[in-house]
């Protein structure tokens, strides 16, 4: 499973959509699990039969093998410190410069 932390923004949505279209199972992560769920529902309309879910960032990170950071750099340190344990052994990809 691929997780997109901060996945409700344009970068996360775009990457999640494309990878879901390619057949990957994805989870949209957000500070607000309800918001992540709504984005996942929106993306599912574009990917019939897709495997897209929404979750809080911590849950998304725990469930995924590969985690994409798709939120502003300024907030990354704080979130990564909170998610140290769920990220152990994961591939973490920062898509924000």
Model-derived features: positions:
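NAD(P)+-binding Rossmann beta1-loop-alpha1 motif at the extreme N-terminus of oxidoreductases
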Residues: 1-42
